[in-house]
Every structure is written in structure tokens, then in C-alpha cells.
């Protein structure tokens, strides 16, 4: 009897949680600015997604740390060797714009927690943890603004180290 009661409570609790989430989703009304941004994004048709970070050094994909069961502390040491000496935001943006792309989406931080920008919330970033010491996002944003191309950001809240 006790097992049936606990099962019943779990089912009721789950159904209430699901119905409240469905209600929250159905009551969302995007604002004018949001709708305009969606339309603009749709009209742009073609953009380039730059998925770049420490994982590029291993040339095995952005999920390499978890897919290969790499120790986080060992993986984090990659930052000490990250020095993209040929990175030139102006050249990158010019080449992307010449391709006909209307926007760039850039991975500012992926699941391993490494940020491609300077942040006060973590020292595990391109400015504080690498010999490169330059804010890649800042440089990319300046080049996009100068050359008139939209810049969107991908930022992962997931963090394999936390």
C-alpha cells in the first residue's frame, strides 16, 4: 500500500511539473524587438559558425575532452600552449564577408569552460590563462562592426568541470 501511495505521489508531482512547464511555454509572447530579430536572422539566410577553442589544438572535435575521457586538469593545461599567432580578426571577417555571409556566430565559451574573452568570473580564459593574452571576442566584435557584418555569440552554460 505504501509503495502505491508513493508511486501515486510521484506521478501527480511529475504531471504537475509538466503541465506548469507547458503552460509557461504556451504563455510566452515574443516582443516586437524579438520578432524583428527573428525575421532579420531568417532574411540573412547565410552565415558562418566559428566553432573554435582549446579543443582545436587536438584536432579531434569540440567534445574531445568528454568523448576521450580526458582528465579535466590535464585538458586545462592546453591553455598554456594556446597561441594562435596567425589570428587576424580583420582578415577573418573580410574573408567571411567576401563569401557572401551576412553574419558570424562565434563560440565564446564551450562546455569545457574555457572563455575566448576576458572575464572577471574565471581565470580560465584566453587573456588570463594563455600566452596569447588577447581578447579574441573583443577583436572579432571590433572587426565585425568596422566591416558591417552581424556577430552572434554561442555561450555554453554547461561546464564539464563544475
Explain the meaning of each model-derived region:
Residues 24-162:
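Mature catalytic domains of secreted/periplasmic carbohydrate-active enzymes
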Amino acid at each position: 500500500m505504501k509503495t502505491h501511495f508513493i508511486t501515486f505521489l510521484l506521478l501527480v508531482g511529475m504531471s504537475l511539473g509538466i503541465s506548469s512547464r507547458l503552460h509557461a511555454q504556451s504563455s510566452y509572447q515574443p516582443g516586437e524587438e524579438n520578432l524583428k530579430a527573428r525575421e532579420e536572422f531568417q532574411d540573412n539566410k547565410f552565415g558562418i559558425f566559428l566553432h573554435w577553442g582549446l579543443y582545436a589544438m587536438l584536432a579531434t572535435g569540440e567534445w574531445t575532452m568528454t568523448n576521450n575521457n580526458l582528465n579535466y586538469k590535464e585538458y586545462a593545461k592546453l591553455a598554456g600552449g594556446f597561441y594562435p599567432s596567425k589570428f587576424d580578426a580583420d582578415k577573418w571577417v573580410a574573408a567571411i564577408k567576401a563569401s557572401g555571409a551576412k553574419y558570424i556566430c562565434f563560440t565564446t565559451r564551450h562546455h569545457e569552460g574555457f572563455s575566448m574573452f576576458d572575464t572577471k568570473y574565471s581565470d580560465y580564459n584566453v587573456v588570463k590563462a594563455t600566452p596569447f593574452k588577447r581578447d579574441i571576442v573583443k577583436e572579432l566584435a571590433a572587426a565585425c562592426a568596422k566591416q558591417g557584418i552581424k556577430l552572434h555569440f554561442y555561450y555554453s552554460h554547461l561546464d564539464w568541470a563544475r
